[in-house]
């Protein structure tokens, strides 16, 4: 008897999470090139928006070089087969932005909340379902909630209508066992028809390993990006993940060489800071800090003549979450005053 092959839905996040790595500065022409390359390379879905989701362009999160609509239009015009996806954080993006994105061709949305605040996603998930969209719940900073607590939040998102719920390791803090425990906890409480996804970051150099363990535990949707382009040390590098998937005999639609070419030729040249594990990005994972805080902390460190790691460690101690970017400057000011008093 032939065993059923593991099938993986590969979701590329280069044009959304990858925006953090380049401070949300990307021309529509560059979006068009990358989207076209991803589509030809066979990814299942392509996510596009400001790094912090629809309407994320702001002084707090970082202004984008262009609007979400310009980026979405550029991607939509160059995708023939992949599912065009976007991200929405309730409190930043609204159902009006969601409807406009749908009008421009977006057919899937991930509704993201902090890992203990799934209840704020109800209106947005329900609206997306009413629009006929594929909907995933995105529980960010998943390391900050125990597996059972996180699973209860996932069940809430499912009850609102989510087709899939993600273990979202925004801080790149989860180890393989921690990922496995959370996926199994999801599976214990979610309906068999509800999919589970994994969104990993590379801060502890575990993004590929965590994604593989997640699939082995029952995940079907995997986030990844070209050259790992993403916040902090980046996301799971799609080329490496696809290579491992090939070795393991998993079924997917991606062409490894085309992904490698797109990563090297289109994405790496965009980086104004290497997307890699280094002393700063490793600190993100070690301290359990939201990966997109990196560039904000680096700017504050330069302004107040501090070690970035000192700021990030204190951010981790205070358990800051997405949306509290403005507090990074406050922390830097406090640390600078303490240093001056010594």
UniProtKB/Swiss-Prot annotation:
Lineage top rank: taxon: Bacteria
Enzyme Commission number, as recorded: 4.1.3.39
Keywords assigned: Aromatic hydrocarbons catabolism, Lyase, Manganese, Metal-binding
Keyword Metal-binding: yes
Keyword Transcription regulation: no
Site (Transition state stabilizer): 16
Binding site residues for substrate: 16-17, 170, 199, 290
Annotated Mn(2+) binding sites: 17, 199, 201
Coiled coil location: none
Gene3D superfamilies the record matches: 1.10.8.60, Aldolase class I (3.20.20.70)
Transmembrane portions of the chain: none
Active site: 20
Biological-process GO terms, alphabetical: catabolic process; L-leucine biosynthetic process
PROSITE patterns in UniProt: PYR_CT (PS50991)
Pfam family, one: DmpG_comm
Molecular function GO labels: 2-isopropylmalate synthase activity; 4-hydroxy-2-oxovalerate aldolase activity; manganese ion binding
Top-level enzyme category: lyase
Pyruvate carboxyltransferase domain residues: 8-260
Reactions this protein catalyses: (S)-4-hydroxy-2-oxopentanoate = acetaldehyde + pyruvate
Family (UniProt): Belongs to the 4-hydroxy-2-oxovalerate aldolase family.
Record's protein name: 4-hydroxy-2-oxovalerate aldolase 2
Source species taxonomy: Bacteria, Bacillati, Actinomycetota, Actinomycetes, Propionibacteriales
């Amino acid at each position: 008897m032939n065993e059923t092959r593991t099938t993986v839905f590969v979701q590329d996040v280069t044009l959304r999470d990858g925006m953090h790595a380049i401070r949300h500065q990307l021309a529509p022409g560059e979006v068009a090139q990358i989207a076209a390359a991803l589509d030809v390379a066979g990814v299942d879905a392509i996510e596009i928006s400001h790094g912090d989701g629809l309407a994320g362009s702001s002084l707090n999160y970082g202004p984008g070089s262009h609007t979400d609509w310009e980026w979405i239009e550029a991607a939509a015009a160059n995708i023939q087969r992949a599912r065009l996806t976007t991200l929405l954080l309730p409190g930043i993006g609204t159902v009006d932005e969601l409807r406009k994105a749908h009008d421009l061709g977006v057919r899937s949305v991930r509704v993201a909340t902090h890992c203990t605040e799934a209840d704020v996603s109800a209106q947005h998930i329900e609206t997306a379902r009413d629009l006929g969209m594929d909907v995933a719940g995105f529980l960010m900073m998943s390391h900050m909630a125990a597996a059972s607590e996180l699973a209860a939040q996932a069940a809430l998102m499912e009850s609102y209508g989510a087709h899939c719920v993600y273990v979202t390791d925004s801080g790149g803090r989860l180890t393989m066992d921690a990922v496995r425990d959370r996926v199994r906890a999801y599976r214990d409480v979610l309906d068999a028809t509800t999919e589970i996804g994994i969104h990993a970051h590379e801060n502890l150099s575990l993004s590929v390993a965590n994604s593989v363990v997640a699939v082995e535990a029952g995940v079907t949707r995997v986030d990844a990006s070209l050259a790992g382009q993403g916040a902090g040390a980046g996301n799971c590098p799609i080329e490496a993940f696809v290579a491992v998937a090939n070795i393991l005999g998993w079924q997917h639609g991606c062409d490894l060489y085309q992904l490698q070419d797109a990563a090297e030729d289109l994405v790496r040249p965009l980086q104004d800071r290497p997307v890699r594990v280094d002393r700063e990005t490793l600190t993100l994972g070690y301290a359990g800090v939201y990966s997109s805080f990196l560039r904000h902390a680096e700017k504050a460190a330069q302004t107040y003549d501090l070690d970035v790691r000192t700021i990030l460690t204190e951010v981790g101690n205070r358990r800051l979450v997405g949306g509290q970017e403005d507090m990074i400057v406050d922390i830097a000011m406090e640390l600078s005053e303490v240093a001056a008093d010594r």
